């Protein structure tokens, strides 16, 4: 894989406890050529010094120090500095599996979006070596739509992005939207998917995703972020479809519908929601959705929310109680 050069972008902010483990795993990567761009986003602990230390030891590590501006700004800084043909976003409290092998790397010549597997582990859990991970790349004979309907990815760390589609030119380059705390990674991914033509799947576990106590994504704070930010993300995606003349294909319809459902589910579990304002937002987004040529959602819950958010909340709470979830 001498011709496969990837830029690994690592946003860093106050992760001194985990950072060395992350960078050590990257330094052991031998399957292809790489550079690692470490973006220190104004860390107040020793994370910035650790980044500099690794850059002095290995020229493949490059460091950018910037004032704290958030993870999206850090990723964008990494994108601007990237020299590789491919892009891989790695979180600084996670690690990668450097021991995988790819038996038929030539298939990558035609791919422009590569999905692979990840494993989740709890903080403090010892990672055991993986067996039978030969990394055989499977480029199926499915159409792009069929492939993307079959294989979904909610973690952008499980993806290689072809830089060609990310950085077409200065005016058309993709970037992470600023000002939102959830969904910006999916927004970036879906926009990229509207451009790519040859998605592929790598049959290997390349990424280790750490589950940290206190970083849960289903607490009330996270649900409130969903309530506030997902409407913005959905709105930007619909505007992107309009500006880029994106066809309303099933794979994209399915993904945006999931965002709608996540928004409604989160809102139903948050206390003190302004139901009137939420209903107005949902109706406006669904109207914009229809104007872009997407079929009106078949989901009975989505239809109910369009008629009455309050009725949706009541039905959803009854359903959750029956399931013993809430």
Features from the language model and the residues they span:
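Short, acidic, metal-binding catalytic loop of nucleotide-sugar glycosyltransferases
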Residues: 24-33
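Donor-binding/catalytic cores of nucleotide-activated saccharide
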Residues: 71, 92-200, 207-225
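Short aromatic/hydrophobic "clamp" motif used to bind/position activated sugar donors
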Residues: 87
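Membrane-interface aromatic/basic loop that binds lipid-linked glycans or pyrophosphate carriers
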Residues: 268-326
């Amino acid at each position: 894989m001498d011709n496969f050069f990837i830029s690994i972008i690592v946003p860093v902010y106050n992760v001194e406890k985990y950072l060395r483990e992350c960078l050590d795993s990257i330094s052991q990567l031998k399957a292809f050529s790489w550079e690692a761009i470490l973006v220190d986003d104004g860390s107040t602990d020793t994370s910035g010094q650790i980044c500099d230390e690794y850059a002095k030891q290995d020229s493949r590590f490059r460091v950018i120090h910037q004032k704290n501006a958030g993870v999206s700004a850090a990723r964008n800084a990494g994108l601007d500095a990237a020299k590789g043909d491919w892009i891989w976003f790695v979180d600084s409290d996670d690690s990668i599996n450097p021991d995988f092998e790819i038996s038929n790397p030539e298939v990558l010549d035609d791919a422009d979006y590569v999905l692979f597997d990840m494993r989740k582990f709890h903080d403090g859990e010892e990672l055991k070596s993986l067996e039978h991970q030969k990394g055989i790349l499977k480029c199926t004979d499915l159409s792009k739509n069929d492939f993307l309907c079959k294989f979904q990815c909610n973690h952008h760390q499980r993806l290689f992005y072809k830089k060609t589609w990310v950085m077409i030119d200065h005016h058309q380059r993709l970037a992470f939207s600023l000002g939102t705390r959830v969904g910006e990674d999916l927004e970036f991914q879906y926009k990229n998917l509207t451009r790519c033509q040859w998605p592929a799947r790598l049959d290997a576990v390349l990424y280790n995703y750490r589950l940290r106590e206190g970083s849960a994504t289903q607490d009330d704070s996270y649900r409130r972020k969903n309530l506030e930010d997902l409407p913005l993300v959905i709105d930007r995606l619909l505007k992107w479809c309009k500006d880029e003349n994106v066809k309303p294909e099933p794979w994209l319809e399915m993904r945006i519908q999931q965002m709608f459902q996540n928004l409604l589910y989160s809102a139903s579990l948050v206390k003190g929601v302004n139901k009137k304002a939420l209903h107005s937002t949902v109706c406006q987004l669904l109207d914009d959705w229809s104007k872009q040529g997407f079929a009106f959602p078949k989901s009975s819950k989505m239809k109910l929310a369009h008629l009455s958010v309050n009725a949706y909340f009541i039905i959803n709470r009854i359903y959750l109680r029956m399931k013993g979830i809430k």
